[in-house]
UniProtKB/Swiss-Prot annotation:
PROSITE patterns: TFIIS_N. Belongs to the IWS1 family. Residues 9-47, 302-314 have a biased composition (Low complexity). Residues 51-60 have a biased composition (Basic and acidic residues). This is Transcription factor IWS1. Transcription factor involved in RNA polymerase II transcription regulation. May function in both SPT15/TBP post-recruitment and recruitment steps of transcription. Keywords: Nucleus, Transcription, Transcription regulation. One of its GO terms (cellular component) is RNA polymerase II, core complex. Residues 189-266 form the TFIIS N-terminal domain.
């Protein structure tokens, strides 16, 4: 082989290798859409094979891609034309409306469940109170039936079921948020049963009385609650019984006054209170006091012994001892209840008077004259 033939042999494959190498390099540098279209066309043209269907296929795919991308671009341009703040506000408003609807439903459901739970709790406590009261009554009845025939070996029967349950009852009655639930479920009926006298005529323990009356004072009890529970009759009994402690009797009277005020239409405001008034006549009082003193003198002259005995009986032991020693006695404290109030005469005072100090009624002219006369004196200026 000659040198020219040797040179020609490797050249042909080099050209064939370079052609497919250049195409992918150009395809990699060019855009992704044009690269797959141009590379196959060059290869088919070089090979001499017809490729109309292949080129059409790529063209059709490009058209489809443009058609698909067109509405997306339009949608993006429509959204971008709006203010992003307004879009964010619209989304936030929608979310708020959805959250409010769900939260309102949940809140109503939670409130309903809570009310149902509280009602069941109060009703269970009511049953426990009634059972405890019934057990104490049965215990007292057994003790009455046994009487003196019981043996010394047996332990005495003590009714302590209500005392055991009292802390739980007070923990419920002392909660202000349960006041409406307590009144609606008629728990006052069980309170009435606890405050009623026992079969042997005795009253409940002092701790039960004091705790329940304090709880009743805090509850907003109305007339319909009293009618439904019958509590008013028991409280009236506590106001009239002599076995009740004075402080509890006063508290019972206070409760009765508060409960009966709306029934009789009375107001708790002092300004609305009706006060009977009576005009005071000083001359009439003087005449009456003179007549009384004359009668006393006449009685002393006619019946000295009887008057002395009456005077001694009217006096206290301290006053009698002071009279025997010829000494003065300190006046004793007395409680006076007035029925009539004096008629006010403040309206008779002239309205144009200006008070300067206590008891003075100098008008502006007199005050000015007095000040000017003081300033006119030479000794007062210094």
């Amino acid at each position: 082989m000659s040198d020219s033939e040797v040179k020609d042999v490797p050249v042909a494959p080099v050209e064939e290798v370079e052609a497919p190498v250049e195409a992918p390099v150009e395809a990699a540098l060019e855009p992704s859409v044009e690269a797959p279209v141009e590379a196959p066309v060059e290869s088919t043209v070089e090979a001499g094979e017809p490729a109309p269907e292949r080129t059409r296929k790529h063209i059709e795919s490009d058209d489809d891609d443009e058609e698909v991308q067109a509405p997306v671009e339009e949608q993006v341009t429509i959204d971008s034309s709006e203010d992003p703040k307004s879009q964010r506000q619209i989304l936030e408003d929608r979310l708020d409306r959805l959250l409010k609807k769900t939260s309102g439903r949940r809140q109503r459901a939670d409130e309903h469940d809570l009310e149902q739970y509280l009602d069941e709790k109060i009703l269970r406590l009511k049953d426990e109170m009634n059972i405890a009261a019934q057990m104490d009554i049965e215990t007292l009845n057994k003790r009455i039936e046994e009487g003196e025939n019981k043996s010394q070996d047996k332990k005495p029967l003590v009714a302590i079921q209500k005392v055991k349950l009292l802390p739980k009852v007070m923990s419920i009655l002392s909660k202000a948020n349960l006041a409406d639930t307590i009144l609606d479920n008629n728990l006052l009926q069980s309170v009435r049963i606890w405050l009623e006298p026992l079969p042997d005529g005795s009253l409940p323990s002092f701790e039960i009385q004091k705790s329940l009356f304090a709880a009743l004072d805090d509850l907003p009890i109305k007339t319909e609650h009293l009618k439904e529970s019958g509590l008013g009759r028991v409280v009236i009994f506590y106001t009239k019984s002599k076995r009740v402690e004075p402080q509890l009797a006063r508290l019972a009277e206070k409760l009765i006054a508060e409960w009966t005020r709306p029934i009789i239409g009375a107001s708790d405001n002092y300004r609305d209170k009706r006060i009977m008034q009576l005009e005071f006549d000083s001359e009439k009082l003087k005449r009456k006091s003179a007549l009384d003193s004359a009668k006393r003198k006449k009685n002393k002259v006619s019946k000295p012994s009887s008057s002395a005995s009456k005077g001694s009986s009217a006096q206290t032991l301290y006053e009698q001892a002071a009279a025997r020693r010829n000494r003065a006695a300190a006046p004793a404290q007395t409680t006076t209840d007035y029925k009539y109030a004096p008629v006010s005469n403040i309206t008779s005072v002239p309205t144009n008077a200006r008070t300067v100090g206590v008891g003075s009624s100098l008008n502006n002219n007199e005050l000015y004259k007095k000040l000017s006369s003081r300033l006119a004196k030479p000794g007062k200026r210094s």
